[in-house]
UniProtKB/Swiss-Prot annotation:
Disulfide bonds: none annotated. Coiled coil: none annotated. It comes from the Archaea. GO terms for molecular function: rRNA binding; structural constituent of ribosome. This protein binds specifically to 23S rRNA. It makes multiple contacts with different domains of the 23S rRNA in the assembled 50S subunit and ribosome. The globular domain of the protein is located near the polypeptide exit tunnel on the outside of the subunit, while an extended beta-hairpin is found that lines the wall of the exit tunnel in the center of the 70S ribosome. This is Large ribosomal subunit protein uL22. Part of the 50S ribosomal subunit.
Length: 156
């Protein structure tokens, strides 16, 4: 199996906390936009933003894969994009991996008030091939797509 790599950061290895979650049954397209929105944010701000999107108080901006996404009035002008959605399933898994990374940072003794998301990315996972029985002895192939999420928190 290949090793886990990430961009070279100019932060001491002891000031980083990492977390990975693999084979998440969520769309890579939604996860891409969620990761792009919270990259570089402080941990508490990112969690608050994602919880607001879950409660539909604020829409998540969609930069890529936004075909058919409506313009939302509750998107902040700082995003410089008007179309957005509420990808709840993807956000639940991102919150889960952020919580794991926060626990890792806490066990390393990092100050959680000054922790920032230095790296977050979503990658394609494995594709599970399934078959659905049809009439007259036939079957139709069905795919289940998965994704991987990786997070690195750093103390600023």
């Amino acid at each position: 199996m290949a090793g886990w790599t990430y961009p070279k950061l100019d932060i001491d290895e002891n000031k980083l906390a990492k977390a990975v979650i693999k084979n998440v049954p969520a769309s890579i397209r939604d996860l891409y936009n969620v990761c792009k929105a919270i990259r570089g944010m402080k941990l508490n701000d990112a969690k608050q933003f994602l919880n607001n999107v879950l409660e539909e108080k604020e829409a998540l901006p969609f930069w890529k894969h936004s075909h058919g996404a409506s313009h939302r009035s509750n998107i902040s002008p700082k995003w410089k994009v008007k179309s957005g959605r509420y990808p709840k399933k993807a956000i639940k898994y991102v919150l889960k991996v952020l919580e794991n990374a926060e626990n890792n940072a806490n066990s390393k003794g990092l100050d959680l008030e000054n922790v920032k998301i230095v790296h977050i990315a979503a990658h394609k996972g494995i594709i599970l091939k399934r078959y659905m029985p049809r009439a007259f002895g036939r079957s139709t192939r069905k795919y289940r797509y998965t994704s991987h999420i990786e997070v690195i928190l750093g103390e600023v």
